[in-house]
């Protein structure tokens, strides 16, 4: 069989096209265990953390490496925090010590009112299998919905209470990139001011 230059080019372009289509279709959120926390404790005024919040942020350097709760033992391998706003830098400040101690980059370029953009980023950019997300508590219900979870099943009245800083939401994502299970647990950290 004699191959012409045109047939070789056509075959090559079809192969490249199928490779690009497969790459575009990859969902990097597939087979992930996603951990979601609220930022650490806040002062009555200001944009940062209070003393208890700074302590919690420091304790996270050990608590999440590895994360061992409820029979899980996973190594967090990517960090995401809601972007700084004029009122709060707390999500970033909560994960900054963990980022520094582990050498993992802290991605904090997406605002907490834009949950869909974070989900899109997790789907389209490689990030590992165990992302940890620190978010503002008032926006966590929207983030849960963006993942396909029900805030009403995970949070009292579908809202994260103002006074709670020590919960972790664990989302398991299946091979098709869809949520397979979701649960809320209480952190086993010993910290003054944490809830029982």
Name the predicted role of every residue range.
Residues 25-128, 139-196:
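Active-site-proximal alpha-helix that buttresses catalytic centers in soluble enzyme cores
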Residues 130-134:
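Periplasmic-binding protein-like
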């Amino acid at each position: 069989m004699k191959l012409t230059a045109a047939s070789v080019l056509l075959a090559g372009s079809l192969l490249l096209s199928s490779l690009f289509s497969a790459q575009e279709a990859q969902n990097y959120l597939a087979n992930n265990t996603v951990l979601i926390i609220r930022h650490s404790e806040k002062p009555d005024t200001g944009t940062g953390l209070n003393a208890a919040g700074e302590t919690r942020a420091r304790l996270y350097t050990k608590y999440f490496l590895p994360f061992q709760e409820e029979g899980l033992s996973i190594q967090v391998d990517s960090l995401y925090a809601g972007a700084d706003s004029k009122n709060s830098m707390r999500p970033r400040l909560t994960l900054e010590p963990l980022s520094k101690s582990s050498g993992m980059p802290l991605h904090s370029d997406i605002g907490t009112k834009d949950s869909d953009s974070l989900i899109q980023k997790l789907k389209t950019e490689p990030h590992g299998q165990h992302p940890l997300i620190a978010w503002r508590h008032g926006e966590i219900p929207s983030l849960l919905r963006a993942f396909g979870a029900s805030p009403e099943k995970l949070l009292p009245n579908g809202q994260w209470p103002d006074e709670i800083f020590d919960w972790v939401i664990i989302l398991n994502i299946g091979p098709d990139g869809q949520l397979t299970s979701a649960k809320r647990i209480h952190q086993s950290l010993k910290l003054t001011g944490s809830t029982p």
